[in-house]
Amino acid sequence: MDLANKAALITGAKRIGAVVGRELAARGVDVAFSYARSKSEAEEAAGQVRSAGRRAEIFQTNLADPGACAALVESAVGALGRLDILINMASVYVQRPFAEVTAADWNAVIDVDLRAAFLCAHAAAPHMRRQGGGRIVNFSDWIAKSGRPRYVGYVPYYVAKTGVIALTEALALELAADNILVNAIAPGPILAPPGTTGDELKAVEDATPLGRWGGEIEIAKGVIALVDSDFITGETIRIDGGRHVK
């Protein structure tokens, strides 16, 4: 897809989302970001897009609210005039022993990581269809793509991210006739969570064949490749430095 003068919506404007938005803007894309609480980071991400000469908007959105997803898409279309690319990046990440997981914990993760991806895609597809096509990029996880859990304490997260892979494949089939290509990224060790110790950093590096953390730009490169392609759909691509083979 020729990216010049297209419009994208990215759910999540922190760290990786900001870099993806910047790289899309560098290729001629206007970008809308949603954010939950990180307004300053969203404003900074929008500023980077504007610095590239493209339009940018930010929208505070509670993606756990089912009605908010359609409202977000309509706001993005209203601000940018069209929608060609949807990047479902927003995620809730909770670590808790299974015995302590409540229904509220389950819903908090499933509602944002899986249901919101479905609802945003559902709202975006008609706009893409009217323009002759579009691209949807969902976000899963390298462990979910591996087909088996590797760590305890992440039941809702693992189920949600595995569901994202199934959603991606189902939407790819449903929307192919409309030239809407649907794929997913399954990140591995990209950014260390805040508070990660030096020993923990090294342990991840030692477990990764390429021997390092990837950084935001590696995800942005993957997203650009998927939205640029005209013949990849239904795929979930691991960007994990080979972590899954070790």
Language-model-detected regions and their locations in the chain:
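C-terminal substrate-recognition "lid" of short-chain dehydrogenase/reductases
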Residues: 180, 215-239, 244
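Substrate-binding pocket helix/loop in short-chain dehydrogenase/reductase
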Residues: 97-98, 105-110, 196, 204
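A short, exposed helix-loop element centered on a Lys and neighboring polar residues
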Residues: 121-122, 169
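Canonical Rossmann dinucleotide-binding motif of NAD(H)/NADP(H)-dependent dehydrogenases/reductases
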Residues: 3-32
